[in-house]
Amino acid sequence: MITPSFIISSFLSLPTVVEASVTNKVNYSKDVIYQIVTDRFSDGNPANNPSGAIFSQNCSDLHKYCGGDWQGIINKMNDGYLTDLGITALWISQPVENVYALHPSGYTSYHGYWARDYKKTNPYFGNFSDFDRLVSTAHNKGIKIIMDFTPNHSSLALETNPNYVENGALYNNGALLGNYSNDRNKLFHHNGGTDFSSYEDSIYRNLYDLADYDLNNKVVDQYLKESIKLWLIKIDGIRVDAVKHMSEGWQTSLMSDIYTYKPVFTFGEWFLGTGEVDPQNHHFANESGMSLLDFQFGQTIRSVLKDRTSNWYDFNEMIKSTEKDYDEVIDQVTFIDNHDMSRFSMVVFNFQTDIALAVLLTSRGVPTIYYGTEQYLTGGNDPDNRKPMKTFDRSTNSYKITSKLASLRQRNSALGYGNTTERWINSDVYIYERKFGNSIVLTAVNSSNRNQTISNLNTSLPQGNYTDELQQLLDGNTITVNANGSANSPQLQANSVAVWQVTKESTSPLIGHVGPMIGKTGNTVTVSGEGFGDKKGSVLFGSTSAEIVSWSNTEIQVKVPNVTAGHYNLSVVNATNTKSPAYEKFEVLSGNQVSVRFAVNNATTNSGTNVYIVGNVSELGNWDPNKAIGPMFNQVMYKYPTWYYDISVPAGKNLEYKYIKKDHNGNVTWQSGNNRTYTSPATGTDTVISNW
């Protein structure tokens, strides 16, 4: 039988792509990620367990290896546990070889964050053949694989003790590159540990006792970029550890390298505490080329439903503010708990976890479920929050809720792409609507211990009666919507959630997602949405048409056109010449990117005045002082009055630039004399120093 999509493909002589499949590695909007600490999930092959002091039989010592491996994950895909849960992406522990030594306090590298060789596997998880089977099994089940990645550091080390653990040693496929206390090639920073007092301090000093890479070192830069490409042959996504502790400039050059080689969805960890809002966090998410774990979402939902220190007004304010602060809020990765915080179910009733999961799965962003949350696994802080999975019960309420809402995310584009509108709110009740085109999801949450009758509720749902998509797993009722959009005063049961929806695909083009959101001319970009039509139209970057690689009604792949570097709005024009609303702020890069450290000596300033750099390419602000890069640093790698900053700039490019000073009122003082000139390297990194 020939499917309609095959007929269309033949007519256009273009391949078609299926939305929300494993082939779309840059769009996770409709996916549900399941985070696994590999060592703690399932032991599928006891033969690869470690021996001796680093292994804990029956996991009685949570600081040690417990036996979980890739075969265990494969088994749980094959027996249907993960697929029936509705999971479409697995975030696994960093798969690379980690240190074997036992820390003096009894700690081990079971978590995967103490790398020693990024070009080898952790043998306690499996070998490369096992990893290939993990990925192929996942893909056959419609599941993507995301790997953790730690380009910030190797492993624990002390300047004064070369025998401490493994001295931060770094290997290149078995060959020693260097170690921390005998760092002849200057692979690491030697500035002591960070006290987290400033952004600069957190970047250029060690995070705790972890040997901090000097990412401005050409050997380190090349090695890390080579290493991730080895894994990119198989994987579908990357979670980058500790992005707050590396320069944005180097990380942007990394993302440019990845997107040119094999674009995959990438998100980073920038930890925020309860109630913490950091503009630098937003800037990074908007400019670096990668998304972030959404700690504002995670901390707020925990405050509302777990700790009961906030209410739904606070949650709604967070939703509204982050929609403004993040250019791509649907690409931020949301959660209710993870490996760096206490388990959500630690001090709450099971129904509170159920409510939190329902909100997570119907809110904007890419939802991530920490392994065992669906089993109400408890635990305090590390390592208690990393207990082994004991049961794989498919009858828990959380398992059923996740399964139903994961399925709805796949079917209804409002959950993947839609905006959020608050429809009714008080301290205990939150009713919010997600809408994309004609598809709508209305979610009603009552987190109080008493029933609530809702008056004056309005919605975009069409006239009709709607049953709860959760089938009363959380005591949701039906709702009746009138022709004018008013609802007939529904009653919400105590501690309940109801989800009502209509799925109706748009017949005119609507862009829901573009990924990645940075790229140079010729890079492949995927445009997802609805109503594109089966016949090829066009995709515009501003007013310039892009080369079409593939086209379907819900997904288009294009090549970034040859346009001047800068930000562009994208739009889709279908075959009947109907144009979509613009999708804003795609950044066209000037070319391949390299990280360069710019430094200027003798730049004295008054209190409240900072130094910036501006120049002749988009990456340096195109001579616009409002887009100048900075404020620059002056405390760690260089001391005031020398200022410095690591910046991603086009490779092999003749650059012109100047330094400027900005005071707290925005007044600008330009560096005198001719423009500074410099040719960036074709590959690698560099440092260029001039005088004020």
UniProtKB/Swiss-Prot annotation:
It is found in: Secreted. It catalyses: Cyclizes part of a (1->4)-alpha-D-glucan chain by formation of a (1->4)-alpha-D-glucosidic bond. Ca(2+) 1 binds at D43, N45, N48, N49, G67, D69. Keywords: Calcium, Disulfide bond, Glycosyltransferase, Metal-binding, Secreted, Signal, Transferase. SUPFAM superfamilies: (Trans)glycosidases, E set domains, Glycosyl hydrolase domain, Starch-binding domain-like. Binds 2 calcium ions per subunit. Coiled coil: none annotated. The record marks D340 as: Transition state stabilizer. Residues 588-692 form the CBM20 domain. One of its GO terms (biological process) is carbohydrate metabolic process. Its EC number is 2.4.1.19. It comes from the Bacteria. Residues 1-20 form the signal peptide. The keyword Metal-binding applies. Disulfide bonds join C59-C66. Substrate binds at Y113, W114, H153, N206, L207, Y208, D209, R239, K244, H245, H339, D382, R386. Residues 509-587 form the IPT/TIG domain. Belongs to the glycosyl hydrolase 13 family. This is Cyclomaltodextrin glucanotransferase. It comes from Brevibacillus brevis.
